[in-house]
Amino acid sequence: MSAAGILAFAQQGWEQVLAKVKWSVVYLDAACAESLHWSCGSSRLLEAVKGPACHLREFEPQAIGGGAKQPRAVFVLSSPLKGRIVDTLQSIICRSHFQHCVVVTAVSHAVHLTANHVPAAAAAELEGQQPVFEQLEEKLCEWMGNENYTAEVLHVPLFLAPVASHLAFTPAFATLFPLLPQDVHALNSARPDKRRLSSLGEVDATALTPELLLYIRCLVSGLSSLCEHLGVREECFAVGPLSRVIATDLANYAPAKNRKKTATGRASVVFVDRTLDLTGAVGHHGDNLVEKIMSVLPQLPGHTHDVMVNMAELTAVQAVEENQNVIAPGCLAPSNEASAKALWEALLNSKHKEAVMEVRRHLVEAASRENLPIKMSMGRVTPGQLMSYIQLFKNNLRALRNHCGLLQLGMATVQTLKHPQTAKWDNFLAFERLLLQSLGDSTMAGVLNQLLPMIKSSSQRTSDDLNPEELLILLIYIYSVPGDVTLDRDLGDVEEKVKKALAHVLSEESELSPLLQKITGCDSAVDLTLPKSQIAVNDVFMALREIAGARNLMRQFKSVYVPGNNTHQASYKPLLKQVVEEIFNPEKSDPIDIEHMSSGLTDLLKTGFSMFMKVSRPHPSDHPLLILFVVGGVTVAEAKMVKDLVASLKPGTQVMVLSTRLLKPLNIPELLFATDRLHPDLGF
């Protein structure tokens, strides 16, 4: 039951798929492609296919069908097999010449029964049977044009993308984000005949939209499969309203009943709502090179996390604009090289300065092994120095092949260090530190006043100034740090000034980024009038107010702000740090805000008896494995902090940090201001 179980679980799932793909055309959706990318890489899939790269295709309605000499197909999908997904399957198969079709879904058959509105009692009677999959197999044969052709539908839990031995994210759930009070109003409007919910604290599974409930059930299905792989029975805990819903669903997940009875190991699974601490999500204090790389380099198309690393300088192709797409980009996902894997682990677990030195050390060692004419230089590591080492590999094909993964990480480091956004990162950090001190000395109105001069229109801005998206990041930081703020006249006046300035800036933008298009509802800057900007900005500030009050439901974890005194400056104390410290508190009292979710009558009786007898309630530190799942995203620096903290507080305890996504600061404005949290797109 080691933390390496994350990678082993993901790879075991993909091995089941790889066993099916020989001589096949393989169609993958984006989430499964991303899981493959981080688990074993597309090269491993190509080896198993034993065909050219054109045999790998994106699963979409316009996808190219199989030709006359391509009788086999494998579809690898992250969604339930229903609606648009099935329509796309039919469309591709009907214009192909397939005689053998395999459909792999990351969603269990039990969840497919839920998706098809089969009552729980009827679903329990179908244990061991798979009628939904069997019906689709019949349809596949019908679409292929011959009932004697071969069709197979199976479930493989391909929901994790492992970044490291202690860290993984879930590509298919990248848009899952905790609810805000405005979502409660929407839920009340959608169910006028039912009891009104007065706050987020009253939200349970019965109150959610069918889409969100099914989305959660898909995640729970995957987590149950992970626990089965690890051989553990899980105790579920929650910090926050949406985490409570997810933890309750996992604790009572009916298909896991038999697994839990026979499991020999034990684990604590603690879910935490990201909205309880957005300071860590948008802050720039992590001092981690990987976070900076992911924030400044362009995103790899179709991926939520990996980036494009320009590798043209290692080729003879001239660096002109028309050649930009000639050379395939590099990326961060670790290759099979031992040195690249070692460097990737070092980058994840080191501070920025140490990480850059590790890049230099690995490049020097690789060059030495290849007998390249390296000139050693000590002292401060510069982008130019790293580039000079990388250039040594340029005309040596064998050396390039041997160290391709390492060189991609090296180039990513150089391009990040030279990127103008990296200098801005330090400016953000300086402002955030100033803000923490200001909160102790002045009011919220005073803090917002400091932001006002930074709000500039596109015609006034220089490259050092903040664009609208970056202003949103700072606003989230400002409202998340202090917690609930009292609206007095001063704050109301300054808020109005900030809103007015921001609305003017938005309406004067010459071009709208994809995020600003979503926030404003306008596809082009021409359509964005001042009144539309004002409506969008009012919505943003409503969400900011709700963020400020997110910890009101907490009794213990009410603050992430530590005021300064005569000896210490004011500081930020991450909520995740507080949660882990409370879990491993040597006093081991019942945690106030870390709720245990009962799984059936036995647990309920224990909880009831504990009120008047000496029956100990389950505690999250009881077990040798802690799985911490952050709903809404986690940063690389936070994952490292959790890992190090657990090792220091309770040596020998294994910890896995899982999340819906790896965060960079710009993700949060999108999840807050431009995502329909109640109606996730499940593909049907």
From Swiss-Prot:
Any Pfam family the entry gives: Sec1
Keyword Protein transport attributed: yes
UniProt entry tagged with the keyword Transport: yes
Keywords: Protein transport, Transport
Gene Ontology biological process terms in this record: protein transport; vesicle-mediated transport
PANTHER family per UniProt: VESICLE PROTEIN SORTING-ASSOCIATED (PTHR11679)
Record-given protein name: Sec1 family domain-containing protein 2
Organism for this UniProt entry: Mus musculus (Mouse)
Origin organism lineage: Eukaryota, Metazoa, Chordata, Craniata, Vertebrata
